[in-house]
Amino acid sequence: MCRVDLCLRPAPGPLVLVEVLPAGSLLSQLLAQGAEEAWVTPGPKVARLLAEELGKEALLLGEVEGFPLEGFHGRLSLVELEGLNLKGKRAILVAPTLNASLLPGEEEVYLVGFRNAKAAWELLRPLKGLVLRPAGAPEPLLSAMVAAGFLQKKLAPHAPLSLASALLRAFPDPQEALFQSPEGQALHKEGRTEELARASLIGVDPVVPRLAGVRFFPKWEYGLTQDRYAQRFVPWNG
């Protein structure tokens, strides 16, 4: 049995964090293409601090209004990074919504979107007490809500009707759901509709990212406005 929780509160069991856009799909693609790990950071300053620690294998990815951040290797783009050999790379993503969707102390966490849905439901089905949390909770992203409904339908087809499953009925086509979402519209306005097509593909990434660690950045030590965290994800094979 699994349930969708729209609140940002500690999960009592294994947590499935669901995000499609803007960063979740890219993270699973990076690991599927051989990246050793993928870090999720709240902003460019923490990302740059982390890159200094990780060294030459760091791959900095982030953007503002569709343009790469200064000194970064690229944008959060499925299209631009597809097919690259990332073996040994240590990706660092600036993804504030995804970063803020996890609470300190949560340990058993899996990241799922449409692209790795098939691998996810095969690996997650044996686990008990799954909680699905759409990214952005307690104000979840529309695309994440629809993906959570899709995943719940596969993992627990007889679960009671939820808002996520109701949205899935309203948007049975994943690509249409992404296009109608605010996060999808932002990409559309930048002329990046191909990103929506790639993010809506189901089951093309054979990996499920699992949380493998959290790096703490105290504000007093690094000159930040508040304490920050960066989460490290690695491929999980069950």
Which residue ranges define each predicted feature?
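Charged, flexible boundary elements
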Residues: 1-8
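Glycine-rich phosphate/diphosphate-binding loops that line cofactor/substrate pockets in enzymes
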Residues: 123-131
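Short beta-strand segments
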Residues: 17-18, 61-63, 93-95, 133-135
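A metal-dependent hydrolase metal-coordination microenvironment
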Residues: 48-49, 59-82
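A short alpha/beta connector and helix-capping loop motif
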Residues: 24-45, 54-55, 64
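Long, charged alpha-helical interface segments
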Residues: 54, 71-109, 126, 142-238
